[in-house]
Amino acid sequence: MRERTVVITGAGTGIGEACARRLGAEGANLVLIGRRREPLERVAAETGGLVLVGDAASSADWAGFVAATRERFGGIDALLACAGGHGLGSATDTSDDAWQAAMRGNLDTAFHSARACLPSLLERRGSIVLLGSIASLAAGPEVCGYTTAKHALLGLTRSLARDYGPQGVRVNCVCPGWVRTPMADEEMQPLMRHYEESLDAAYARVTAEVPLRRPAQAEEIAALCRFLISDEASILTGATLVADGGSSIVDLPTLAYERMGDTP
């Protein structure tokens, strides 16, 4: 990764932050993009990355991001599109504004990021990783906007991979399950209040039926993102790498048989 220039959206927290720390430790030139300056500056203090504050779903902001990146580093070798997070509520509970926010936060950010970086990526035969979710593959309760947008990321991954593969640009998607991040910690709060339990106990509860019986650490997902933009993954494009501890392989109806031994 030494001297490769990697653009990371959502770089101030969670998986984006973990990617920055991992790649910065390997000598990559980092471009750290997000809405809030303070967390980006904190990450940059450790990694030496270029901090760019703005909206990853804005074409105008991206024009500035790309210009600043070219001025500092000359071009772009990889994009990690980690921004996202909106979209709670069932369809009937989702207002027009909430729907637009879900699409903008989870899908538009990825599209605008890819479109803006592609000219430079084409020059360098670079790669893109879009951060999906287990919600790209399955539907949780009352997360209509988030689930729809994350499903659409798979289509975006495949479309980009099909269109730009002949010019040497690879595009892949990582779909984590539960990952211990500040955003996921917030999602544990209702369980903690309802069951009067700790954060660790809440994570244990949501992963109780996951084959590995635990959430991922952000660093584990960062390692997969690093692999996908490396030369070691040179034949991979259009792929969906599921990193969910095995939750998506569970045949849910058969859990009833496993639980027979739990009944008195």
Describe each region flagged by the PLM.
Residues 119, 162-166, 234:
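Alpha-helical segment proximal to the catalytic Tyr-Lys
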Residues 173, 181, 196-232, 236, ...:
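C-terminal helical subdomain
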Residues 138, 226, 237-264:
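Short C-terminal tail/terminal secondary-structure segment
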Residues 90-91, 95-103, 206:
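Substrate-binding pocket helix/loop in short-chain dehydrogenase/reductase
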Residues 114, 149, 157:
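Active-site helix of classical SDR
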Residues 12-14:
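Conserved glycine-rich cofactor-binding loop
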Residues 133:
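Residue(s) in the substrate-gating loop at a strand-loop-helix junction
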